[in-house]
Amino acid sequence: MPKYRSATTTHGRNMAGARALWRATGMTDSDFGKPIIAVVNSFTQFVPGHVHLRDLGKLVAEQIEASGGVAKEFNTIAVDDGIAMGHGGMLYSLPSRELIADSVEYMVNAHCADAMVCISNCDKITPGMLMASLRLNIPVIFVSGGPMEAGKTKLSDQIIKLDLVDAMIQGADPKVSDDQSNQVERSACPTCGSCSGMFTANSMNCLTEALGLSQPGNGSLLATHADRKQLFLNAGKRIVELTKRYYEQDDESALPRNIASKAAFENAMTLDIAMGGSTNTVLHLLAAAQEAEIDFTMSDIDKLSRKVPQLCKVAPSTQKYHMEDVHRAGGVLGILGELDRAGLLNRNVKNVLGLTLPQTLEQYDITVTQDEAVKKMFRAGPAGIRTTQAFSQDCRWDSLDDDRAAGCIRSLEYAYSKDGGLAVLYGNFAENGCIVKTAGVDDSILKFTGPAKVYESQDDAVEAILGGKVVEGDVVVIRYEGPKGGPGMQEMLYPTSFLKSMGLGKACALITDGRFSGGTSGLSIGHVSPEAASGGTIALIEDGDTIAIDIPNRSIQLQLNEAEIAARREAQEARGDKAWTPKNRQRQVSFALRAYASLATSADKGAVRDKSKLGG
């Protein structure tokens, strides 16, 4: 029988000092012996996806204490990728994932907590907490802040839905008037919550639900809706049950590594491909799998991407649907239900409620459930009122969207495309693979060949795009922006948005060893591995080289013979200690970022730290 970890600090005469300090936090004699459960919050006023979380930790803590546990809350950092985008701040986004994971480990292990409730929401916070949870392998439940309502405004006598990306594109489009740009900016992000499309934050919260580590509805129920409060109340109660099951009944099925098994990871990736999720999810799932000691690789993702269709299309791939529409159509379990009927899921998995996948679908798939309370929950909709308050409205759709032929979520028979929303490409400068969000690529450019325009920083590429130096047919290559080379693997949302604003969204390709925001669409290929700074062939591409992209055949090729590539590699090596570094880039890199870069691996490994350099 496992011993409560917290007993290390609460039992025995030699722990009198620790107990004295626990008493100073409000604990009494009756608390010593109860499970101590960490409430891992991420409230900050910097991030709309987290601005409403301040009181939600207290909500969870009250339920933990009412259920027989002791709750202790702490906070992690949280970076807003949208605000950090397009300047030096983006260098810090991906490294913050590792800091978050480490800080959770530090706090939980330093104080011997027995279990956790993770209150996350946005881009690097959910992955960081997920990595920590699988590293620690103690009972955990995730409950996120929820998606933002879609922005809405009237343009050309028509009400349209908006998000952050629309504001960025219109702000850079010289053909858009100042008045219209201002109108879109003010309408794009109306409430608290994670940005309203299938961007990285919402993608990861959906995948956490598919992994079984959060409750049904967690990935799609709006941040502003009163129904979301119940998820927090349930999490506080349920975590005590899971904790006691493990420590008092020796039930290892309560542990996250047994819930988020390899089968669950495959299901999560299958969901991601079917819903056209952010390419960042690939990076984060690979990293989380390593923490769980699961053999889940780019090869597994490639195999899944070749057989899973696209069953859901959401912004930024279409303006028609946002997360509020996904929820109305049944949310994550609506998509999983269709995938299950298509025979594409592993059914032998369980979630934090202890339900198998078939049991969960029977109760929560809107196309089969008889539970009226579940149907009511999935009718939770937007109010259209600007607010930063959680649970501030209780509006509902008049009906569910259960139209699997023409609705937001489709059945296999009526799939948006036979090929899924993500694909892995391989070639002579992406030997270990690269990722493209096919859900956002127009059919006319699934095959694309053109001359390279090479830039060694995102800033130079943006200047060239806005300066008219990139023209129709070009393949923009942005390198030395990988985990090690950036450092920090910047997102390239501004270059892709500016290509659209210049009328080149369907006329150019963009390739990088960096990554893309979940808000990116178009022929945008990222995560090229190995990256330039690690000796990747992408570092050898020159202006004018021909690059051929063939998404249907999963191929990307630099059209040079092997002898020429070898000669360029030899010339690069001859640069000595300057080899595999940008030639003319002026970038101040802090000591903290240099420390991150010294251990960073390429994207095909999840951009995690190279344990071999630490003797592990």
Swiss-Prot record:
Its cofactor is [2Fe-2S] cluster; Mg(2+). The active site is at S517. The modification N6-carboxylysine is found at K124. One of its GO terms (cellular component) is cytosol. Pfam families: ILV_EDD_C (PF24877), ILVD_EDD_N (PF00920). GO terms for biological process: isoleucine biosynthetic process; L-valine biosynthetic process. The keyword Iron-sulfur applies. Transmembrane segments: none annotated. It catalyses: (2R)-2,3-dihydroxy-3-methylbutanoate = 3-methyl-2-oxobutanoate + H2O; (2R,3R)-2,3-dihydroxy-3-methylpentanoate = (S)-3-methyl-2-oxopentanoate + H2O. SUPFAM superfamilies: IlvD/EDD N-terminal domain-like (SSF143975), LeuD/IlvD-like (SSF52016). Binds 1 [2Fe-2S] cluster per subunit. This cluster acts as a Lewis acid cofactor. Keywords: 2Fe-2S, Amino-acid biosynthesis, Branched-chain amino acid biosynthesis, Iron, Iron-sulfur, Lyase, Magnesium, Metal-binding. InterPro entries: Dihydro-acid_dehy_C, DihydroxyA_deHydtase, DiOHA_6PGluconate_deHydtase_CS, ILV_EDD_C, ILV_EDD_N, IlvD/EDD_N. Its EC number is 4.2.1.9. One of its GO terms (molecular function) is 2 iron, 2 sulfur cluster binding. Mg(2+) binds at D81, D123, K124, E491. The keyword Transport does not apply. [2Fe-2S] cluster binds at C122, C195. Belongs to the IlvD/Edd family. NCBIfam families: ilvD, PRK12448.1. Functions in the biosynthesis of branched-chain amino acids. Catalyzes the dehydration of (2R,3R)-2,3-dihydroxy-3-methylpentanoate (2,3-dihydroxy-3-methylvalerate) into 2-oxo-3-methylpentanoate (2-oxo-3-methylvalerate) and of (2R)-2,3-dihydroxy-3-methylbutanoate (2,3-dihydroxyisovalerate) into 2-oxo-3-methylbutanoate (2-oxoisovalerate), the penultimate precursor to L-isoleucine and L-valine, respectively. This is Dihydroxy-acid dehydratase. The lineage of its organism: Bacteria, Pseudomonadati, Pseudomonadota, Gammaproteobacteria, Enterobacterales.
